Amino acid sequence: MALARAASGQAVTLVPPDGPLAAQTAALVKADQFEAIHLVVPEGREIAEHAVEGPITLFCLEGEAEIGLPDGRVTLAAGQWLYLDGGVPHSVYGTRASRLLLTIVLLAAPGT
């Protein structure tokens, strides 16, 4: 079941009480100030190291993922939340099949 983009004021079920779970990464909303993404990381899959300009948060909805950081790795299990400053290089590895809620703060370009 694919997740559709959310409209302002619309409730979205990210963790259904039963039935099939969303199995693919999908942008939930992208506004001028932030973007929210339902991120699916299969077991054994790695998202290579990268960085984004603005701060991010990762909330583990299901499974377990390792976040690679310059100073080591942090394990996120279901129910755990992580904040990263903008520009921090990081990778994501699915130690178990995982679903994460990724929020990215979008910084305005200078002069806009």
Segments from the language model and where they lie:
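Short, conserved beta-strand element in jelly-roll/cupin
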Residues: 40-42, 52-66
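A short, N-terminal "cap"/entry segment at the start of jelly-roll beta-barrel domains
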Residues: 1-33
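Short acidic-glycine-tyrosine-enriched beta hairpin
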Residues: 71-87
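Conserved short histidine dyad/triad with adjacent acidic residue
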Residues: 22, 35-52
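Short beta-strand His + acidic residue motifs that chelate non-heme Fe in jelly-roll/DSBH
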Residues: 47-49, 67-68, 84, 89-95
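Ligand-binding loop in jelly-roll beta-barrel domains
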Residues: 86-110
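Structural motif
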Residues: 64-66, 73, 89, 99
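A cytosolic small-molecule/anion-sensing beta-strand core signal
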Residues: 61-62, 77-78, 96
